[in-house]
Amino acid sequence: MTIISVTLEIHHHITERDADRSLTILDEQLYSFAFSTVHITKKRNGGGSLNNYSSSIPLTPSTSQEDLYFSVPPTANTPTPICKQSMGWSNLFTSEKGSDPDKGRKALESHADTIGSGRAIPIKQGMLLKRSGKWLKTWKKKYVTLCSNGVLTYYSSLGDYMKNIHKKEIDLRTSTIKVPGKWPSLATSACAPISSSKSNGLSKDMEALHMSANSDIGLGDSICFSPSISSTTSPKLNLPPSPHANKKKHLKKKSTNNLKDDGLSSTAEEEEEKFMIVSVTGQTCHFKATTYEERDAWVQAIQSQILASLQSCESSKSKSQLTSQSEAMALQSIQNMRGNSHCVDCETQNPKWASLNLGVLMCIECSGIHRSLGTRLSRVRSLELDDWPVELRKVMSSIGNDLANSIWEGSSQGQTKPSIESTREEKERWIRSKYEHKLFLAPLPCTELSLGQHLLRATADEDLRTAILLLAHGSREEVNETCGEGDGCTALHLACRKGNVVLAQLLIWYGVDVMARDAHGNTALTYARQASSQECINVLLQYGCPDECV
């Protein structure tokens, strides 16, 4: 039966209602007949190549009769081959009725790994909701990629990613990740008692440390820590439930597969699906996944990349790239200070990371734990990767590990300090006890003065050790206490009057008000100019002190 007879027979029996279905049948028969004819021709000629069959249907008739018979056998005997070819071509490649309208978009997303030639291949990518930084706080879809170079990039759409435009990047080397309503990633609310040969004797102290409220929040009798990240393997996510998880449990709903454009959901669901990336500058980016599982996968991948990038990155500055020989000597002098040849918390040799407000050096593993404490307690910076302005170099050169430990471990009560062989969990227990809970902090000196007045005297006397001890014990209100007798000066005024940039910088980190004025209406900047201390001037301007001379 020829193609013409097949066509006439089918069109003779079809109705207008079944036109679409019959045309599909016609397409299938045309394709089957064409393929069988080509196969016969190949066998008759003793073989031949059939690769790229779709290109064998020409848009115009061929000049060779033999080629015409091979290429378009279904229409070789028809008086109007071009029309028939056009019909067959359009029907074969026309999408069927009821096809998925998102098919094209899904195909693009499924091949996203092949998009963006020449760029770093993402180790994780997908659509997330990101909260805008504007006052409306709306959630918008972003296409997010995580690359092995330690950079998280987000785009307005998949199309922008393909074109590599309208992107914003987050450097994970100077960032940390947080999940609202969760304990720190290395902590869990309940676990078996710790009985290790390497125990540092903190179990009892940790049980007694500020745990009187545990019975009120349902945590049980104690809190202990469980391992989640080792120094030799990539970190694994271990996010224990929030202390209020039981109260929210009945509010949780099953996750859906579609992103919610309006971001409206129950409070508990929002809490569970969100995570935040906080940079060292304090900038926070809020993201939200579609499901809890997707959120956990992103958090684990980002945490792994933070650790991996810190471990694998090399110094971006060599000795020849230092701005001056004096800067190189200053950094070397920091490393040569007493106690700075070993990590302040675990005694690992040759530490390359620093905590600015503590004035200490530490190893890379302890720096990760310090970073999780937040910038309020520890401002982590790399000796090799970051820039070191003169005021920061002076802070580090004035304190050092020995002086800091005489304060923060002043009453350690014979506890065994972690060593290089200690597990990460033992190091974290020690660090949190030392800086967060202040278990080992040296006691305040006996004096009739209040802490705030004592701090003012120590600043006026430029007694750095006493000032650090008082700042560690003090509150923001005590740090901002003013001199009596109507003077109105804060400790920052006194530090700038002396031109002491180390005390000025420490006071700012511990919460002193840089906008405060004394009884004469002068800010600390006025006293810094009177003392001709350009370093104090730079620090004050950096933190927003009003410059009335401009």
From Swiss-Prot:
Chain intervals for the UniProt region annotation (Disordered): 232-270
CDD domains from the UniProt entry: ArfGap_AGAP2
Single annotated GO MF: GTPase activator activity
Presence of keyword DNA damage: no
InterPro entries: Ankyrin_rpt, Ankyrin_rpt-contain_sf, Arf-GAP_GTPase_ANK_PH, ARFGAP/RecO, ArfGAP_dom, ArfGAP_dom_sf, PH-like_dom_sf, PH_domain
Residue span, PH domain: 121-307
Alphabetic keyword roster: ANK repeat, GTPase activation, Metal-binding, Repeat, Zinc, Zinc-finger
Sequence ranges assigned to domain Arf-GAP in this UniProt record: 328-448
Compositionally biased tracts (Basic residues): 245-255
Chain positions of all zinc fingers (C4-type): 343-366
First and last residues of every ANK repeat: 487-516, 520-549
The protein's role, per its UniProt record: Putative GTPase-activating protein.
Family the entry assigns: Belongs to the centaurin gamma-like family.
Name this protein carries in UniProt: Arf-GAP with GTPase, ANK repeat and PH domain-containing protein 11
Organism: Homo sapiens (Human)
Lineage: Eukaryota, Metazoa, Chordata, Craniata, Vertebrata
